[in-house]
Amino acid sequence: NADAIIFHTDICLSPKTNILDGRRKIACANFSSPPRNKLLRNEESMNFTHLHVHTEYSLLDGSSKIGEITKRAKELGMDSLAITDHGVMYGVIDFYKAAKEAGIKPILGCEVYVAPGSRFEKTPGESEDRYYHLVLLAENNTGYQNLMKIVSRGFTEGFYYKPRVDYEVLTEYHEGIIALSACLAGEVQRYLARGMYEMGMEAAKRYENIFGKGNFFLELQDHGISTQQYVNQQLVRMSEELNIELVATNDIHYTYAEDADAHDILLCIQTGKLVTDENRMRYEGGQYYCKSPEEMAELFSYAPQAIENTYKIAQRCNVEIEFGVTKVPKYEVPEGYDSWSYLNHLCYEGLAKRYPDMNADGEIDSTQGIYNIKERLEYELSVIQTMGYVDYFLIVWDYINYSRVNGIPVGPGRGSAAGS
């Protein structure tokens, strides 16, 4: 094999000796995925799960179609697969359904952006240090709820070029979440790549303190980039010194190795560059595809525990989403009431104000004769209760009432509770 020099983003990388096993490795080695029609029998497959996966919902960055990659994982003998799109979770439901249909367990996650300081700070720093990457996986339904809160806070409070969160948010919503240190853009890896080992250790200990012992893992990746070879060596050392376990991942951005060129064009669209531009963002080496368990085991033969840990993590992650069921938030009612009695109280109170001439039997004398308004109210309330919308009507009453009290105009609604 001839020596080669490649470009990864704006850094020139040359072939380097693999520090971990002493073998010479070319940084730009050509890899190809197994044939598309290859099916691994269960007895041939090994326990491995991809935990770092970007789909088409990582806009202009991931090109893996959800239906395609879930089927591919199944073909390669895996029984579970994660989704970890950049900063968003709007692909989770489609992924969950597709994974179930493919016969594999969906692991719901997100690769979030972590601000180096407060999420509220909106001042530009060094381009590399505006945010760090961190992979979060929901271990259970509590973790799934917390993960949604983390991502939402990134948009509502921390958005600055990217939806960022900070250590405060991670600490507040850490329960039920497993964290991985991510790629070279992760905080730990970024320090290590700069030769700042002690700073990397402090970052790792901080994340472990946030998520708890056994819930934070140091992430090994190898895409043929020489910097990763050095960082991986430091991560192995750090794992031994801090007793933080390793996990092996492939930073999947497309499903098959032959999709690399199409993905490169997608990056050009994202960055406004031409394919022929030399100094532009690119994912060199063609290794960001859904690799087989055998490929991953060979790539990380020096750290078999990191491979095993992918499956152990997958076994821990169990989120169940129920579809076809109306889920209404519970309205907090005053002491002495439940939702049903409080809605009745408000309705009868309003009835007395609107119809002061109503008699004790609930009858009013209209132009069309005697009309029992109380019977009508009781019927409407029974329908609301039967449909399970008691709390919903209280919620709508609450914000409409707040608007009226605070001088916010409220208009008639068409076909909605607000206009009732």
Enumerate the predicted regions with their spans:
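Accessible peptide chain termini
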Residues: 1-2, 310
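Short hydrophobic alpha-helical segments enriched in small aliphatic residues
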Residues: 2-4, 9, 19-22, 29
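Phosphodiester-processing cores and adjacent nucleic acid-binding clamps
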Residues: 23, 27-31, 36-420
